Amino acid sequence: MAPKVFYISDGTAITAEVFGHAVLSQFPLEFESLTIPFVETLTKAEQVKRQINDCFITTGERPLVFHSIVKAEIRDIIYSSEGLDYDFLNTFVAPLEQHLGVSASPVLHRTHGKANHGYEARIDAINFAMDNDDGQTMKHMDQADLVLLGVSRCGKTPSSLYLSMQFGIKAANYPFTEDDMDNLKLPDALKRNKKKLFGLTIDPVRLHEIRQSRMENSRYSSLKQCRLEVKEVEMLFKRERIPYIDTTNHSVEEIATKILDVTGLERHMF
């Protein structure tokens, strides 16, 4: 039976999920998880406590409880459950108070709330990524922080969206298609913004597998075409001295982190 995990917060539960996932990913196990956000009242906290206790009674195993709860009275109710408790905020707040010599002044939803000064910047970045996805337009390249280049289905769109959502980076992306291969070159709008360009490549066999699931047995998905496109685009990257990375078997989080590391782009944390 898969171990049971609860992610609980009086906010969005994003922090609890990220922390919990990071810890549990160290173990070669499958976990069955439940996320419960916005536990903002004592009544809701008691309901969650009963869920945790019922899980313990049913399975005979204490469920893992990762939480980031600001309100002490709600946190105390979760503490009193039969779950194995991992309190992200309290673990770090007390030592930081001692080190900084300042008492914490918890404000609910401060990290992810709309009142945060970076909210508008993040929304602008997300809109920019969607408006400038897959070479839809070249009019806004001058406004981009980053322009991702690569063959179709190499990870450009998810990487652009992740960078915009997580770090407020205005990331456009531009695809090189089958029609470009005979005379592969940078469009003028990209040449003008060459310092913003970053390439993504991928193993041709993996690209073939991805494209097969989209357009099976087509020229677009053939291994021969995939090899040709990857070879030509990598040659362009080298010729134009555009930095690039291989996305094969890497998660979007890993790809984004590598891009930031190579480019030195500033992360805007929200």
From Swiss-Prot:
EC number(s) from the headed UniProt entry: 2.7.11.33, 2.7.4.28
Top-rank lineage group of the source organism: Bacteria
Catalytic activity as recorded in UniProt: [pyruvate, water dikinase] + ADP = [pyruvate, water dikinase]-phosphate + AMP + H(+); [pyruvate, water dikinase]-phosphate + phosphate + H(+) = [pyruvate, water dikinase] + diphosphate
Keyword terms: Kinase, Nucleotide-binding, Serine/threonine-protein kinase, Transferase
Binding site for ADP: G150, V151, S152, R153, C154, G155, K156, T157
Disulfide bridges in this chain: none
MF (Gene Ontology): ADP binding; ATP binding; phosphotransferase activity, phosphate group as acceptor; protein serine/threonine kinase activity
Family: Belongs to the pyruvate, phosphate/water dikinase regulatory protein family. PSRP subfamily.
NCBIfam families linked: PRK05339.1
Function: Bifunctional serine/threonine kinase and phosphorylase involved in the regulation of the phosphoenolpyruvate synthase (PEPS) by catalyzing its phosphorylation/dephosphorylation.
Protein name (database record): Putative phosphoenolpyruvate synthase regulatory protein
